[in-house]
Amino acid sequence: MEIDWQIGPASEWRADALIFFGLEEATEPLPGFKRWLDQHGQWLSASPVLRDFQGKYQEVAVCYGPPEANIPRVVMAGLGTREKFDMERLQGSAAAALNRCRELRLARPAFCLRSFYGLPLMVDSALKEALIGGLTGLHRYEELKTRDIAPSAAPSRLVVLNEYETTPELRALPGAAAAAAAGIILARDLVSSPANRATPAFLADCARRLADRDGCRIEVIGLEKAESMGMGGFAAVARGSRQPACMIVLERFPEADRRESPIVFVGKGITFDTGGISLKPRDHLEEMKQDMAGAAAVLGAFETLGRLGSDRHVVGIMPCTENMPGGNAYKPGDVIRTMSGLTVEVISTDAEGRMVLCDALTYAMRYKPAAVFDIATLTAAVIIALGQRVAAVMANRDILAEAVVDIGAQVGERLWPLPLYDLYFDYLKSDVADFKNVGDRTAGSIVGGMFLKQFVPDTTPWAHLDIAGTAWTDKDLGTTPRGGTGFGVRTLTELALQWPDLGIR
């Protein structure tokens, strides 16, 4: 969908529908809507639809005016009460409004910049989040359907209206919103893709397309080379599958000043997780195609950074394989030597994510990174702890965990810090190796983070994002239909963009 500005007197604005927002229990309309109503919407004042509109969250009302009018419809989108207003509600309301426009087959709906006046959010931020919510809320993963497909009725163009010329920064916001939405949509589609399609090779092809478009350096390390490099953890998991495994390495601006150490993102890319020999139960097993959501988030962040033309030096490392049972699969009781030289006793082959990530983290140190962020659907325990709308973050610096939480909040991705006290390592102690890959059921998410911590030097800022709960949704969330959510794309993107200003060493 294209997004255009239209600058000029409100009497000259043209659109199939003009979208305004309303708060529940408000004594009067938001100031931007009130002004437009007084000056140009007299026909709307007497509308029973407007009088019945209550402003409840995601309530949508369509008011019809004279067919010959420049703007023959007004779409009212409810935000709920002011006390509960947040960025996510604005995104959801914008998505609800644009989905109603889709149902009405409107080709050219519009947001008015003044419609965001009076909200507890800066106007530029409100515009950007409404656009992102609308764009992502309209998208559906239907690429593989062949029957009962309705012709796409999504708007082809979205217009932003304003009476006066805006600043260059404000002018650029629709492009930034489209870039963010594109990254989220890419990640969602990869996660929602079936595992017989979204194989490790498929993810590698996606990475190559990004590299070709943006001039990134790319290396795809196959299993044989990974074994020769000593990646015992990655290889142990990969040997159980017939699908060729690979470690994907993407680097933005490899010719950047080498005095600028890169930010490294490490994303878990288990394209299907049966649990291996420690076989998972059958319930919801089909959803284990989502176990590559960490890698998808990294690719989504690269998609956004590329569209933004960012000059940040960023590396993405994605260990991609299936975790399957079979004659070559690794087994409980095996001892694996990792790329770091540390040995791991395998207690559960269903804790495969940390086995592939540990080698990716060791490989990341070759870049002498300014910081490392790994993102993974690592533990079911995090769902028990935080549910499906909040992810966990663990870090080797408290200030870094706080920064991740804060940046996530800025973009509507909720994260919560969990501790990594040294005492948690006791759960990993082994009689036959340096440590085990799991403990008992106690503190499962934290113990997973503690395992990964062993592979990052204390001198390197590192954070682990456990997105096992947030990577997938079983219900339509307004901006996110059932399936992959794209969680983490915006947090990773902002970490890359804001890192120089965070002052963390």
Curated annotation (Swiss-Prot):
It comes from the Bacteria. Keywords: Aminopeptidase, Cytoplasm, Hydrolase, Manganese, Metal-binding, Protease. PROSITE patterns: CYTOSOL_AP (PS00631). The active site is at residues 280, 354. Mn(2+) 2 binds at residues 268, 273, 291, 352. This is Probable cytosol aminopeptidase. Gene3D superfamilies: Leucine Aminopeptidase, subunit E, domain 1, Zn peptidases. It is found in: Cytoplasm. InterPro entries: Leucine_aapep/pepB, Macro_dom-like, Peptidase_M17_C, Peptidase_M17_leu_NH2_pept, Peptidase_M17_N. It catalyses: Release of an N-terminal amino acid, Xaa-|-Yaa-, in which Xaa is preferably Leu, but may be other amino acids including Pro although not Arg or Lys, and Yaa may be Pro. Amino acid amides and methyl esters are also readily hydrolyzed, but rates on arylamides are exceedingly low; Release of an N-terminal amino acid, preferentially leucine, but not glutamic or aspartic acids. It comes from Syntrophobacter fumaroxidans (strain DSM 10017 / MPOB). Mn(2+) 1 binds at residues 273, 350, 352. GO terms for biological process: proteolysis. GO terms for cellular component: cytoplasm. Pfam families: Peptidase_M17 (PF00883), Peptidase_M17_N (PF02789). Binds 2 manganese ions per subunit.
